[in-house]
Amino acid sequence: MDFISYFKHIELTEDDHLPMLPMGRARSSEALKTMKSPRESAVGIHCFPCAAGKLSIFLIQRSEYQGKHSGQIAFPGGKMEADDPDLIYTARRECYEEVGISMHEGEYIRSLSPVYIPVSNFKMTPYFFYHETQPITIHNEREVQQIIPLSLESLAHQLPIEH
């Protein structure tokens, strides 16, 4: 079974992301119960094969501005707009706006558990997409300072990230 097939079918719980939360941040499931009207948002995790058949994803570094997410390393994404039919659409639209990945590129694989982002009161849902080849990207300089390709192997083995 390849990674994508495995990932499609693995059982995930609501709090599987907890080990990655910053120290002191409340569990998302608990925080969401106490928050009033968190804003829906979505990010796209675009996975693709790179050198030697290894899988990679993109991160972005947000541009510097007078906002709460200035300069952050993140997945491309943002808030749901009133005319977005659903959050998958939001993830695709935001990825197109920020890094130029066409809204029709990438096979939708699955969503991951929503995470509460306290600084902006976002309930953020990650959506995972697979591409047969590395997608062509063009970053929106107003929103994105740089696009950072990252091999999944470097995450698994905690290797230094080169960009």
PLM-predicted stretches and their roles:
Residues M1-A74, K79-P135:
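N-terminal leader/linker segments that precede catalytic domains of diphosphate-processing enzymes
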